[in-house]
A protein has these predicted regions:
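Sec-dependent N-terminal signal peptides
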Residues: 1-4
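C-terminal motif of bacterial Sec signal peptides marking the signal peptidase cleavage site
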Residues: 7-11
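A well-ordered secondary-structure block
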Residues: 80-158
Length: 158
């Protein structure tokens, strides 16, 4: 039964055994498909899911939620942002919660946002920036009141 379960798990993501490419079944697959389908319709390249960069995206989403719910403390947000992104080295976030994106601007773009109000348009607002990305990080965080927030970040890893 364990072999069958493993076969089913790897079949869902094209047969990969690379742990960085295996997508959780929490809506991530649908998000990545929507991004890549929209990109294809716009004549843009595809991005590849990354568990590693999804964890960075999750930490950034938690940091943004702290800002959002605890009085919009920009200095604290920025300090935590720098800590989280320090581990990226030369990798840059080019879409989503970028270094230059103020938390309020992110809120206005609806990325991050509640899962229901998330706007995919923000990902493609600047096609030249989108084209810099090779990897995508997807994160969902459920708040204490049960609201699910979603964030998507695109990463330039080359």
């Amino acid at each position: 039964a364990g072999v069958l379960a493993l076969a089913m798990l790897t079949a869902c993501d094209g047969g990969t055994t690379d742990p960085d490419k295996i997508m959780p079944e929490d809506g991530t697959v649908e998000v990545v498909m929507k991004i890549n389908n929209t990109a294809a319709n716009k004549g843009l390249g595809q991005v590849e899911y990354s568990a590693k960069y999804s964890e960075v995206t999750r930490k950034l989403l938690v940091n943004w939620l702290e800002w959002h719910t605890n009085g919009n403390q920009n200095t604290k947000y920025r300090e935590e942002y720098e800590k989280i992104t320090a581990e990226l080295g030369n990798v840059k976030i080019v879409v989503g919660l970028t270094k230059d994106t103020a938390p309020l601007a992110a809120q206005t773009n609806y990325n991050p946002a509640t899962r229901a109000s998330f706007k995919y348009d923000s990902i493609f607002a600047d096609p030249s920036t989108y084209e810099l990305a090779e990897k995508v990080g997807v994160a969902f965080v459920t708040t204490s009141d049960g609201t699910v927030y979603q964030a998507v970040c695109l990463f330039d890893v080359n």
